[in-house]
A protein has these predicted regions:
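Phosphate-ester processing/binding pockets and catalytic centers
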Residues: 1-256
Length: 256
């Protein structure tokens, strides 16, 4: 079973969508269930190295918030840019060493608002918030990615016979208080595109990001994807490191 931790680019305290963000971005970090323990261990060791103790203990933040680290806010106000950059890179290296795949989908929020206002796209009227079409497209991309993984495991006899046994499965995990809801999965699996997505677990599991190192790493991926979308003409070394080292596998621009 693959666990897909849904990072979001939102800057709000509880992870909910921020209306001031120009893009709605989700980043699904896919880890096999056998990898989670080692990721947690590396993450805790990293935090002890940078903070002197684990997250949540005296003198340390409760969790890693990408905006705070990147801009030197809150706990990081006294840190030098070099120290903050090193911590970010150390976090990303946990994923880079494993080539842990990240699948991202994004939508320009202004495009969404204009499509609904002008009724330029009938499909836009089916969605209430930008996260709705973004998650629909993300789940489609995840389903296709699982299909590719399943195809890669087929032997010659299975291919010749047309057999397509499903051996790769994925469960989506959303962070508590965020805008990803169970109904999004239910609607996708009932749609024409999702009806054959036999590798997707039908339930979305909700976790507290403070208790999930993988979710915090997924949020970092979403944050730096957002920064790349905002200023694609500028150097974005953290995003480029993820992309060039085969972590970011899918970048799905959602259209309406």
């Amino acid at each position: 079973m693959h666990l897909v931790y849904m990072g979001q680019s939102a800057k709000t305290e509880n992870g909910a969508s921020d209306p001031n963000d120009p893009f709605e971005v989700v980043a699904g970090l896919m880890l096999h269930e056998t990898q989670v323990t080692s990721v947690n261990g590396e993450f805790d060791a990293l935090c002890r190295r940078h903070f002197g103790s684990s997250l949540g203990e005296d003198g340390t933040p409760q969790m890693l918030r990408p905006l705070d680290i990147f801009e030197g806010l809150e706990h990081y106000s006294s840190w030098t840019p070099e120290k903050r950059s090193q911590m970010i890179q150390d976090c990303l290296d946990i994923l880079i060493r494993r080539e842990a795949p990240v699948l991202s989908a994004f939508l320009n929020n202004q495009t969404f608002a204009e499509a609904r206002t002008n009724a330029a796209s009938p499909a836009a009227l089916l969605w209430n918030e930008p996260i709705d079409p973004v998650m629909s497209r993300f789940l489609f991309a995840l389903s296709m990615y699982l299909d590719e993984m399943n195809m890669a495991t087929l032997n010659h006899d299975q291919i010749m016979s047309g057999a397509f046994p499903v051996s790769q499965f994925a469960m989506v995990l959303a962070q508590e208080g965020a805008s990803i809801q169970q109904q999004m999965m239910t609607d996708f699996l009932r749609s024409d595109e999702g009806v054959d997505s036999t590798g997707l677990h039908e339930n979305i599991c909700v976790v507290n990001a403070q208790d999930s190192p993988a979710m915090q790493l997924a949020n970092l991926c979403a944050f730096f994807t957002l920064r790349w979308l905002q200023t694609p003409e500028n150097p974005n070394p953290f995003f480029e490191a993820l992309r060039d080292n085969k972590v970011i596998q899918v970048l799905y621009p959602v259209s309406l």
